[in-house]
From Swiss-Prot:
It comes from Drosophila melanogaster. The keyword Cell membrane applies. It comes from the Eukaryota. Belongs to the insect chemoreceptor superfamily. Gustatory receptor (GR) family. Gr2a subfamily. GO terms for biological process: chemosensory behavior; male courtship behavior; monoatomic ion transmembrane transport; sensory perception of taste; signal transduction. The gene is Gr23a. One of its GO terms (cellular component) is membrane. It is found in: Cell membrane. The chain crosses the membrane at residues 7-27, 37-57, 73-93, 113-133, 227-247, 264-284, 344-364. Residues 28-36, 94-112, 248-263, 365-374 are extracellular. Expressed in the adult labellar chemosensory neurons and labral sense organ. Expressed in neurons of the dorsal pharyngeal sense organ of larvae. This is Gustatory receptor 23a.
Amino acid sequence: MFPPTRVQASSRVVLKIFHFILVAFSLRSRRLSRLVLWLQFLGWLTWFISMWTQSVIYAQTIDCTLDCSLRHILTFFQTVSHAFIVVTSFLDGFRIKQDQLDEPIAFEDSDPWLAFTVLAMLVPTLGVEYLVCSNAPEYAFRIRIYHLKTLPSFLALQVQIISFILEVMKVNIRVRQTKLQLLILARELSCRWPQRKQKPQFSDQQAHRVKDLKRRYNDLHYLFVRINGYFGGSLLTIIIVHFAIFVSNSYWLFVDIRTRPWRIYAILLNLGFIFNVALQMAAACWHCQQSYNLGRQIGCLISKLVKPQGSKLYNDLVSEFSLQTLHQRFVVTAKDFFSLNLHLLSSMFAAVVTYLVILIQFMFAERSSTRGSG
């Protein structure tokens, strides 16, 4: 083994720190002792109960406007989603199964591209939170309380979807390696001398390689099944939360732009939230679309392995491999409710526009009723 380069060593440090962040937010608990699991769970449970209680009491003491209602909805969505992941992680820490997914982010990894992805996703998130904290005294009391309540859950959900993106990227690296091996085999079959191809030893050797590729493809499909099982529930809740954040901050951005004089920090803050959500959803859907496309490309390459003059065993293996790629697609889903791909992005954009128009209509209706009563 060669010693790691500086880039690999730095990447390993970044991924190791990211793993500790996952543990701190109770998003990973497989390697923790039971005492630590219980302490983490009770700590988060106390936080969630106290926050929900204060929100209910506060909501009953004031006359809630549309802006206030949106903040209560976002607080509920974000904290409930985080609580769901915490409970799932807590139960997963006591469950020992052979077929469960290992720690999704192994801090022994040193892939620079993974570390760069972590930094590219975390820096905008931390930048938005810096804007929130540095300008907190200028906000109204209800807005400061809203950001304080949602800060841990907001960061936890951001970190969780980043870990999901990294896991899909790691599997895609293996898929590309399998595709490369298949492409090499197809080129060898088309470039070797015809007399050598007629030998039984050559046919048996290629049949063994096809069988090995079939096994690799099956293992890759199983990795996607485990990703769906591990991240499916959290993905469903996170996508719902991200949709609500995108719609709400788009509405607040529209309100801030119409307000004179402009509040630059408020506009930048809403743009930051919108950018974070758009970046993470686009990255997740793009990498999942890449997984699906790579699987289809492997299926198309199998046609190049067909040998009319080959043995029956070889051609049967190629036919089975082709059927396997048709039935075992590399698809990532959120508990089978929907698949993550680029089509999901277009559907979400259309839904965002629809709900944004509805909120704007409610805003004008609320202001008209206020003026009428005044």
